[in-house]
């Protein structure tokens, strides 16, 4: 069956965007981002948007789902999936096979594994009525509504318990906003992988480049614009540790060292997620390093024209 979507996934610093841009130029295609942080405006260096990479030989490659919301907006996987489906169908309607590129495993899985989701709003009245209840009582309430709990960690954390009760109480009611019927997706999925030592070196080099490019100033300006330090931590490792440095809670050297260590650990977690996707039936064709010719060879005869 001919494929109608090319996917290029990989851990941070693997060079997947550069490969995707080259491919988009050769196929006259367009890129759709699968990155949970690049949706935010004004967060460029820390999220690794590398917008210059979308220009190749003087040609600008169209890209979607980048810079679409402000940092104070709570973007989520439900909204990502909905927006992706709209992008996918619109691009495909013009006779173009889109290229999905990114490393946010949850977003990739939501699309490729066809997650069926229901968006449940917070119930402030319910939360107010339960705020004085002890943990044991909240556990009892949840188990009374849904005796079979799939995620037992919901029973151990107060915040997760309240959210689980909200969702359980809404289950089966009318008026819920459900994820849209998904279009038929026939993906050809490529994964970019590197030798572990080489990937560590790439991560360290890219962090050094980002710090030189003004990462610290970016975080400082975001905070001065009204984004709290706590909120900045939500956006990931770079914003968390640079924020700690700007608050004089660690030295520059300590910040750089901790960032390198934790970004490497994050890359390992990304690789673990990709293996999980394979176990769930997603076939991934692995490309060693940035071997563009190997990627092109695998594409032959597979794409919808």
Swiss-Prot record:
Site feature location: Interaction with substrate tRNA: 104
UniProt GO molecular function: ATP binding; tRNA dimethylallyltransferase activity
Interaction with substrate tRNA, as annotated region: 35-38
Keyword Protein transport among record annotations: no
SUPFAM superfamilies for this protein: P-loop containing nucleoside triphosphate hydrolases
Binding residues annotated for ATP, in chain numbering: 10-17
Top-level taxon of the source organism: Bacteria
Record carries keyword Cytoplasm: no
Residues annotated as binding substrate: 12-17
Names of required cofactors: Mg(2+)
EC number(s) per entry: 2.5.1.75
Annotated keywords: ATP-binding, Magnesium, Nucleotide-binding, Transferase, tRNA processing
One BP annotation, GO: tRNA modification
Catalytic activity: adenosine(37) in tRNA + dimethylallyl diphosphate = N(6)-dimethylallyladenosine(37) in tRNA + diphosphate
Family of the protein in this entry: Belongs to the IPP transferase family.
Subunit structure: Monomer.
Annotated function: Catalyzes the transfer of a dimethylallyl group onto the adenine at position 37 in tRNAs that read codons beginning with uridine, leading to the formation of N6-(dimethylallyl)adenosine (i(6)A).
Designated name of the protein: tRNA dimethylallyltransferase 1
Species, as recorded: Syntrophus aciditrophicus (strain SB)
Gene transcribed to yield this protein: miaA1
């Amino acid at each position: 069956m001919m494929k109608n979507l090319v996917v290029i996934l990989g851990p941070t610093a693997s060079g997947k965007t550069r490969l995707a841009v080259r491919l988009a130029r050769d196929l006259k295609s367009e890129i759709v981002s699968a990155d949970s942080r690049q949706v935010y405006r004004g967060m460029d260096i820390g999220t690794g948007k590398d917008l210059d990479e979308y220009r190749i030989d003087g040609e600008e490659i169209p890209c979607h789902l980048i810079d679409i919301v402000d940092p104070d907006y709570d973007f989520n996987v439900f909204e990502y999936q909905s927006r992706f489906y709209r992008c996918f169908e619109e691009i495909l309607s013009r006779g173009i096979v889109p290229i999905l590129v990114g490393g946010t495993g949850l977003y990739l899985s939501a699309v490729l594994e066809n997650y069926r989701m229901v968006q449940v709003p917070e119930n402030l009245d319910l939360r107010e009525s339960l705020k004085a209840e002890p943990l044991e009582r909240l556990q009892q309430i949840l188990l009374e509504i849904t005796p079979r709990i799939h995620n037992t960690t919901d029973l151990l954390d107060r915040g997760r318990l309240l959210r689980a009760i909200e969702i359980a109480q809404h289950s089966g009611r009318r008026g819920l906003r459900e994820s849209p019927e998904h279009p038929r997706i026939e993906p050809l999925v490529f994964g970019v992988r590197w030798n572990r030592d080489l990937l560590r070196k790439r991560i360290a080099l890219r962090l050094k480049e980002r710090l030189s490019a003004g990462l610290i100033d970016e975080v400082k300006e975001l905070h001065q614009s009204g984004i709290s330090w706590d909120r900045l931590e939500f956006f990931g490792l770079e914003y968390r540790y640079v924020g700690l440095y700007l608050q004089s809670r660690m030295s520059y050297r300590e910040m750089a060292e901790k960032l390198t260590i934790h970004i490497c650990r994050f890359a390992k977690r990304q690789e673990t997620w990709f293996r999980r996707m394979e176990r769930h039936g997603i076939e991934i064709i692995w490309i060693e390093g940035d071997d563009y010719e190997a990627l092109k060879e695998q594409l032959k005869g597979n794409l919808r024209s």
